[in-house]
């Protein structure tokens, strides 16, 4: 399946939805565009967030179930991304898509609450992704530092590299604890809005710092595709952006 929230003019500000679903008694008529949709072409079922009443603000947003092949539903451009290139990311276009009334999820106006809840849980997953990227970059860097020699000794014997590895390790351990804490909150059915935002912010920042240092430790080899750290650095960047940017996480943390 695919979760369809972001639009060309509605990213961090999810309330500024331009996608409209007009109520025609026994059905809705959907028009608009969605961007950055993961599983855009491979999904068979889509949860689409759309505005039904602009005057009601976030209370005028609903979520609808759509299926691939519905008349007027077009899978458009596949994004040529910096990282996570194996992820199927597309633009979706909706031109007068007729949606049965029973395809609306929940009560009228439920869409915004649904979207925010989905993002809050998704942030824990992105934090775990970032943690995995950072840990992978650290493991590769540690192994490389034990093999690569300069000035008559392996580079892990140089204090400059030791300090980099030590900082990477501390960052990763902190991120791991925050990720596990937020996941535990969710498992225990506790409020995880704050802990999820903290975990995602810290883990994504750690992933970016760690992968940059991993490339530096590898030197020239870190810059070529023969070694995996350049890919990890490209993959790390998106964790600071999707499911809410680092700046949005700071807003969530401050408000909680």
Residue spans for each PLM region:
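A short, Trp-centered hydrophobic/proline-enriched beta-strand micro-motif
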Residues: 1-5
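Short Gly/Pro-enriched turn/cap motifs at secondary-structure boundaries
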Residues: 9-12, 36-39, 53-55, 81-88
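Alpha-helical interface subdomain recognition
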Residues: 11-16, 23-28, 91-93, 110-256
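Short, solvent-exposed loop/turn segments at the edges of secondary structure
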Residues: 14-16, 42-43, 58-59, 87-89, ...
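Flexible, small-/acidic-enriched active-site or ligand-binding loops
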Residues: 16-17, 71-100
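Short beta-strand-to-turn element immediately C-terminal to the catalytic PLP-Schiff-base lysine
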Residues: 22, 48-52, 65-67, 93-95, ...
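A short core secondary-structure module
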Residues: 31-75
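Short, charged, solvent-exposed linker or helix-capping segments at domain edges/interfaces
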Residues: 60, 75-77, 100-108
